[in-house]
A protein has these predicted regions:
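Acidic/His- and Gly-rich active-site-bordering loop/insert found
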Residues: 1-87, 303, 311, 321
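Short, surface-exposed alpha-helical segments at coil->helix boundaries
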Residues: 7, 24-28, 94, 242-246, ...
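Active-site metal-coordination/substrate-binding segment of hydrolases
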Residues: 57-114, 128, 328
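Short beta-strand/turn micro-motifs at beta-sheet edges
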Residues: 72-73, 147-151, 213-219
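Acidic/histidine-rich catalytic neighborhood of metal-dependent amide-processing enzymes
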Residues: 95-156, 162
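Metal-dependent amide/peptide-bond hydrolase catalytic core
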Residues: 143, 157-355
Length: 355
């Protein structure tokens, strides 16, 4: 396969809409393209596109997600950039995986997974694969830039807090149910601020009010709802935070009945920079003319699911600038995409001859 074939691969994948939970057309297309390249390709029980190539004792999983967030961006190539929804997050990394693995390496079996529902709270594709036997190495497909490797992601906790109470006349004394909900939010925010005072970036616990509705009533019951999201650094557990929120909500919700529902939760994930896999990337990036750097991310990825489940060397890697994730300007520099394929080939060669 040539570089132009690899560019057509990523362009074709980006051209197929694949909103989270609606990935079927893109999955079938990618399975067909992998089969053409010599992969043993299929759709697994979760709906993931899965391609396996090569034989050998060493097993490397390259898992990227095939779903995208909403947003219709006309797909085109301009000034050496592929523009379109998913070009960076994360069809570019996924296509680079397929392109790199097409070149077989003696003694190495590679499984490429185009995972579904990464952009949904379910992470259904990764969770399905997590139940399988662990590989020797795992690379998660997320934009890091061609010469950088991501070794840590914050965790995530999404909560829905509902307050209900008997309906009251509008002239009745005391706070409204909406005001009680605001008191709950203030207590949660203040407690979060006390957790990591003075911390910046990756070390900081971030807490946001992501949505609120209030004052709804059917004439019998008044309701208010908060949607609260945390980004969690290593050292803080999601169940610990959820317990704290339940205590705070019930203590500051006045006479309303308060329920706290966990909508989604992922523990923080961090992997050492000294693993054979991380060193393989350092060497492969150097061979491609770069100097590797390591990144930590405030978001989450399928690494949060697979790193604790498999307990094997794991990093996230892929071409693209993550500042374009989920934006109307999503674009992938194609030269960087081709460089990333070269780096990934170097990593796979090193898997056949471990450092």
């Amino acid at each position: 396969m040539t570089s132009s074939d690899d560019i057509e691969l990523v362009r074709g994948l980006v051209e197929i809409p694949s909103l989270s939970r609606h990935e079927g057309d893109a999955v079938e297309w990618l399975v067909a393209r992998m089969a053409e390249r010599g992969f043993r390709a299929t759709v697994d029980d979760a709906g993931n596109a899965v391609g396996e190539i090569g034989d050998g004792a060493r097993h490397v999983v390259l898992l990227g997600h095939i779903d995208t967030v909403p947003g219709d961006i006309p797909v085109r190539i301009e000034d050496g950039e592929l523009i379109g929804r998913g070009a960076v997050d994360a069809k570019g990394p996924l296509a680079a995986f397929v392109a790199a693995a097409t070149e077989k390496v003696a003694g190495v079996r590679v499984t490429v997974v185009g995972a579904v529902e990464e952009e949904s709270p379910t992470s259904a594709g990764a969770r399905h694969r997590a139940r399988l036997a662990a590989p020797d190495w795992c690379v998660i497909g997320e934009p890091s830039s061609w010469d950088a490797v991501t070794v840590a992601y914050k965790g995530r906790l999404a909560l829905r807090i509902a307050l209900t109470r008997d309906a009251r006349h509008g002239a009745a004394p005391g706070p409204t149910v909406t005001e009680e909900a605001l008191a709950v939010w203030t207590a949660i925010r203040d407690a979060s601020d006390r957790r990591t005072p003075g911390a910046d970036g990756f070390a900081r616990l971030d807490c946001r009010l992501e949505g609120m509705s209030g004052g709804t009533s059917d004439g019998l019951v008044e309701r208010a709802e908060l949607r609260v999201g945390y980004r969690i650094p290593p050292g803080i557990a999601t169940d610990e935070l959820a317990h704290e929120v339940r205590t705070l909500a019930r203590g500051h919700g006045g006479d309303a009945h308060v329920t706290v529902e966990i909508v989604g939760a992922e523990e923080p994930a961090r992997t050492p920079r000294s693993t054979p896999l991380a060193r393989a990337f350092v060497g492969a990036i150097a061979d491609a003319g770069g100097a590797a750097t390591f990144k930590v991310k405030s978001g989450t990825s399928d690494m949060n699911v697979l790193a604790p489940a498999w307990a094997c060397p794991t990093v996230a890697y892929g071409p693209g600038d993550s500042r374009y994730d989920h934006t109307p300007m999503e674009r992938l520099v194609l030269d960087d995409y081709v460089r990333a394929i070269t780096v990934l080939k170097g990593v796979l060669r090193r898997a056949g001859a471990p450092i």
